[in-house]
Amino acid sequence: MGRGRRRRGAGVTVDAASEHSRTRPTPRPLPDPEILAFLYLEARLADEGRYSEWESLWADDDDTVEYRVPMHPDDDPRTTLAYINDNRRRIKSRVAQLNTGNRHSQTPPSVMRRIVSNSEVVAEDADTVTVESNFALFEYRIRQRFWAGRVIHTIRRSADGLRLIRKVVHLVDAGGPVETLAFLI
């Protein structure tokens, strides 16, 4: 075998020089502590059923706000159905409904705890930061359920503090049978 060439199982020969010249992945930046604290607050308020406080984290401009749980990560929200596809008005309506306590699918109410981890900044400009995180949500209502996936938060920095303008939740088991999402995921 020639110099600089190496045999790799099943008769496959790889040029050793090109094998080492491949682009290595680089870590994404971590969110700053203020952004992480905001993500943890959003998760805690949802877990504790503090719906009005959770809603207050959202920006007020209806044309940019999006809360979505697609059936598939590549789905176009304009042309496909989603488990949740809310604008700002719909978020307000969802929270008002949750606050009544009159949801058959939440009687008794779920007890929830979620873990948000592996958070990475995927985009940032002067006013906004987009963070992707893994999440695991443990829900107990009559029996235990487990929800997991990747969540994308876009947060705007403003004079009145941080405001959520986009939350997209990609469930691991999206596309399959999903029980009711009668809570904030």
PLM features per residue range, with description:
Residues 14-19, 111-113, 120-185:
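A beta-strand edge to alpha-helix "cap/lid" segment located at domain peripheries
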Residues 42, 54, 91, 131, ...:
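Hydrophobic pocket/interface hotspot
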